[in-house]
UniProtKB/Swiss-Prot annotation:
HAMAP family attached to this UniProt entry: UPF0145
Pfam families recorded: YbjQ_1
Protein name, as recorded: UPF0145 protein PSHAa1882
Family according to the record: Belongs to the UPF0145 family.
Species annotation: Pseudoalteromonas translucida (strain TAC 125)
Matches recorded under PANTHER family: UPF0145 PROTEIN YBJQ
Gene3D superfamilies membership: Hypothetical protein apc22750. Chain B
Length: 107
């Protein structure tokens, strides 16, 4: 899995398809309160950092599974996008999209 389209030591034999993986995580009210305290007093909020890390890992794992289901042995040009979805005063949701190109590389 690469964030770049090319690497000097890898030869792309075939580009299969653009692939994506999406994950949505609920950010409960307690995490929101802790985040606001961290914002007020400074410092890092480990609870939210852990949620972000879990979301990233899950999205990349799902992206890898999607690539393998197409017969790819690599993913290039990986991009991660994070968004927050909130509405109606309810606890927000973290939405992450991982995208890339499923390829077959020379082994």
């Amino acid at each position: 899995m690469l964030t770049t389209e090319t690497a000097s030591n890898l030869k792309v034999l075939k580009r299969l398809d653009v692939i994506t993986a999406e994950c949505v995580y609920g950010m409960n009210i307690f995490k929101d309160i802790l985040a606001s305290l961290s914002d007020t007093f400074g410092g890092r909020n480990k609870s939210i950092q852990n949620t972000l890390r879990d979301a990233r890992r899950t999205a990349l794992t799902e992206l890898r599974k999607e690539a393998y289901s197409l017969g790819a042995n690599a993913v290039i040009g990986i991009d991660l996008d994070y968004s927050e979805i909130s509405g109606g005063g309810k606890a927000g949701m973290l939405f992450i999209v991982a995208s890339g190109t499923a390829v077959i590389i020379e082994q």
